[in-house]
Amino acid sequence: MRKGKKFISAALGFALVFQSFAGIGPVAVAATGDVDINSTFTDANFRSYVSSNFDTNKDGTLSEKEIDAVTSLNVSISTYSKKISSLAGVDVFTSLEYLDCSGQAIGSLDVADLENLKSINASSDQLTTFTLPKKAEQLASVNLSYNQITDITFQTTYAALKELNVYGNQLTSIDLSKLPALVRLNVGYNALSVLDLSKNTNLEFLHCQSMTKLQTLDISSNSADHTKLAYVDCSHMLSGGQGAIKELDVTGDTGLKTLIADDNSIDVLNMDGATSLLTLSVAGNKIKSIDVSK
């Protein structure tokens, strides 16, 4: 037994001496839950931002405490001037509530696991794909304007989402039925042929300009209650030609105060019961007469 102990001690001693001469030094092992910054954040500029702002003890890793402390992340081009092409690794910040990466060069963004998000601003990011949180009970605002997104899927009900801006993308369809709290919606400059707002009865502001394939826009209160709707702009703003909208129905929308639908192909305008209307602009359409007496 003594010989065995001596052999083990000698072996350990040799290992320590060898390590010392090899210049290896103590082996750093990250504690459970810690995140290595270099291997996790692949974009050099994003990695630099994370290191500077969140690695408080400058040890090259993010501890659970450091990660949990991150509730806001702003790398918008107006705030952080360095270009970022990927936010890979952002999913480690599970306490994140506010994310602004607008104006960057991010082709794809996946925030599926960030369930505490309240606000997302990823406008003007060159996005082609975007994945929403799988669950986000507090998510109130999403801005994805000026990208190249072709599809957006709301996999669950986002009961707190009040503002959605997807202006200037390449969407051909969008299902808004899981956004019951929506107050402000901007879907302008997309290729939507159908816009179903029957489940969005809290909607107050609607922007759907230059919809080149949308022929019928029914936002009446006939089949759904749209009495909260106060502002609608479905004008055609592209140079040359007219918009595709032929029929516009705002019947029964008693809260509607402003309706702008210039330069479309409208020949049928139903607005019976829109008794609060103060501003009506429908120039450049095919309407022969308008009855505003009802």
List PLM regions with ranges.
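N-terminal capping/linker segments that flank leucine-rich repeat
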Residues: 2-12, 16-98, 115, 137, ...
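Conserved hydrophobic beta-strand positions in leucine-rich repeat
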Residues: 73-77, 99-101, 120-122, 140-144, ...
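Serine/threonine-enriched low-complexity regions in disordered or flexible coil/loop segments
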Residues: 81, 211, 237-238, 242
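A generic tandem-repeat structural signature
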Residues: 114-124, 131-136, 143-145
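Short glycine/acidic-rich loop motifs that flank beta-strands on beta-rich extracellular proteins
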Residues: 127-128, 149-150, 171, 192-193, ...
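Short, intrinsically disordered, charge-balanced linker/junction segments flanking boundaries
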Residues: 288-294
